[in-house]
Amino acid sequence: MAQWNQLQQLDTRYLEQLHQLYSDSFPMELRQFLAPWIESQDWAYAASKESHATLVFHNLLGEIDQQYSRFLQESNVLYQHNLRRIKQFLQSRYLEKPMEIARIVARCLWEESRLLQTAATAAQQGGQANHPTAAVVTEKQQMLEQHLQDVRKRVQDLEQKMKVVENLQDDFDFNYKTLKSQGDMQDLNGNNQSVTRQKMQQLEQMLTALDQMRRSIVSELAGLLSAMEYVQKTLTDEELADWKRRQQIACIGGPPNICLDRLENWITSLAESQLQTRQQIKKLEELQQKVSYKGDPIVQHRPMLEERIVELFRNLMKSAFVVERQPCMPMHPDRPLVIKTGVQFTTKVRLLVKFPELNYQLKIKVCIDKDSGDVAALRGSRKFNILGTNTKVMNMEESNNGSLSAEFKHLTLREQRCGNGGRANCDASLIVTEELHLITFETEVYHQGLKIDLETHSLPVVVISNICQMPNAWASILWYNMLTNNPKNVNFFTKPPIGTWDQVAEVLSWQFSSTTKRGLSIEQLTTLAEKLLGPGVNYSGCQITWAKFCKENMAGKGFSFWVWLDNIIDLVKKYILALWNEGYIMGFISKERERAILSTKPPGTFLLRFSESSKEGGVTFTWVEKDISGKTQIQSVEPYTKQQLNNMSFAEIIMGYKIMDATNILVSPLVYLYPDIPKEEAFGKYCRPESQEHPEADPGSAAPYLKTKFICVTPTTCSNTIDLPMSPRTLDSLMQFGNNGEGAEPSAGGQFESLTFDMELTSECATSPM
């Protein structure tokens, strides 16, 4: 079954997570219309190869045209309009950046597969009593459901008792007025009043019963309000707080378990019960106005009950107003909460009380740093204005599940310029990527005679003015959301708390697993721990400061740990994503460990790892070989950076890499990817077929062109070889080989970085006849 069809059969909670994946950057409608074709493409490869991305993008536009023709034949005007709009949007945004749409689609498809896997795992664990985590969560939710059901039942029982009391009071009122009228007549006629006294006794008995019923109802109302208070505290202080924490985790790459539908159903159910109870309390006031007496419990307790139910409902409504989707720039969906001035960002708010009567009634206003006292307390903090459509009315039509929400799609920030270049005080206490700002959403609710002011705010955001500030800004977002669940601590970085390696390791792994199909292994994390903390046996519980993580240079390096790692993450996403997803890149491994695992392998075995010395992010390969004396040697090529990988894919570099041996013959030192995968099996599918690489020769030309192929060659000196006699033919060949590369800019990749001895080596990227 196609992946998209499987997704349609999931429960509502999973479908809500599916909705979170899609936005204007890649509309869900397009995913629906072209599901089979989209799933048949290799988007991961397209995301790492611009030429292939361009081809796939143009094929995508062609598929849209074909689907449009089908809708045209079906006279489906709405779908025609939507598809035309989608195509125009894709052309305007991705025509010059086809790799961007490829990355977005690849990420969505991978998240879909993760969602299916999560649903399947949950289904398998549903009936297993030996899964403690699943059992605790299920039991907790069942208890909450039972409490809500109990509240609803008690409200309905009270409704019936209110009717009984009302009927009893009507009977008492009628008999009392009748007796009073008869008593007046008897007084006028002077008749015996024995009958009247008998009826008075009956009225007293009715009043006693009425008083008992009233006291019972007042007592039950007080107990019901206490039960509501308990359920509300569980919902807001536990369930909603847990959701907000999960949202924080999801923002920094953690599991996207942030569905709100179930929580919305619970809160809506409680709100409905509270409003019904408030009407019952109002009914008590009506009964009191008709019949009242000395010691009336309604007179004594109704005002307090009214005050309690109104306070509960107000607090529930205030808690139910949440930011469903945190501020995020569409071009950087994997890095929310970082906003660049002048660049549009989106956000979405939602009211978890699903009352149809509130549809199109709540006007939301957006502002930034409303409570500017905390922000202003930081010397030199910048100030911003929100531009664009900063007001919107909440409605149920825009959301896929009918929730009451408002999505802001066209917001931008502009810095308020001051005389010293925009900063309020040049003596700033924090750098700009450590400044935290809050985006606030406000509205007013008028419902059943109540006016309630609602306000919620985003998680703290970092505002940058240049995209080069993104790495440090994202580090701030990671550190904040990793270490605190305080949603408003804009002073966090005046004294940033210390994290533990266990916390940092989990977040670092998320940076890979959230944008690729693979997180970090224990061995890879251990290597990173060694870079941060130095050699050690057990890093669990070791403390890491904010400065060590992001600001201080690593030992012997001119850059920080985070700058180095972030550039590697960028390198993986843009250039070697497919190879990383396959698990072919060992990545983070110490040179000692590298030597240990390769030294026992046959010559030609190689592994792929990230450079430890390249600030911009580099990837290299290390292989084992035998020198002429039979001694095992471990060799590494100088790391390939983004600049080289822009011109040739890493898979093609590996497949074509050559060295010139002692006999001046080009040979490939790379045979088996560690541990024993043939090179062709691992990387062949990621190289273009020769038929695509070399177009047909012009049939009208005098002679066909000779086909050429770019390969990376490392010519060696004789420092580690015995001088061999060289024939004139070999010398001529080498001279010609050197002249072919004359004038060309030498590639940074292709040079040895010897792990055993120093070698004087050069690098050339040459063309050789096919």
Curated annotation (Swiss-Prot):
Record Pfam families: SH2, STAT_alpha, STAT_bind, STAT_int, STAT_linker
Phenotype for residue 87 to R: Decreased transcription activator activity and interaction with EP300
Essential for nuclear import (motif): residue ranges: 150-162
GO CC list: chromatin; cytoplasm; cytosol; glutamatergic synapse; mitochondrial inner membrane; nucleoplasm; nucleus; plasma membrane
Outcome of substituting residue 447 to D: In ADMIO1; uncertain significance
UniProt-recorded Gene Ontology molecular function terms: CCR5 chemokine receptor binding; chromatin DNA binding; DNA binding; DNA-binding transcription activator activity, RNA polymerase II-specific; DNA-binding transcription factor activity; DNA-binding transcription factor activity, RNA polymerase II-specific; DNA-binding transcription factor binding; identical protein binding
Gene3D superfamilies with a match to the protein in the record: EF-hand (1.10.238.10), SH2 domain (3.30.505.10), STAT transcription factor, all-alpha domain (1.20.1050.20), STAT transcription factor, DNA-binding domain (2.60.40.630), STAT transcription factor, N-terminal domain (1.10.532.10)
Single GO biological process annotation from the record: regulation of DNA-templated transcription
Principal place of residence: cytoplasm
Disulfide-bond pairs as recorded: none
Positions bearing Phosphoserine: 727
Mutagenesis or variant effect for residue 663 to I: In ADMIO1; likely pathogenic
PROSITE patterns for this protein: SH2 (PS50001)
Modified residues (N-acetylalanine): 2
Family: Belongs to the transcription factor STAT family.
Further remarks about this protein from its record: Involved in the gp130-mediated signaling pathway.
Protein name stated in the entry: Signal transducer and activator of transcription 3
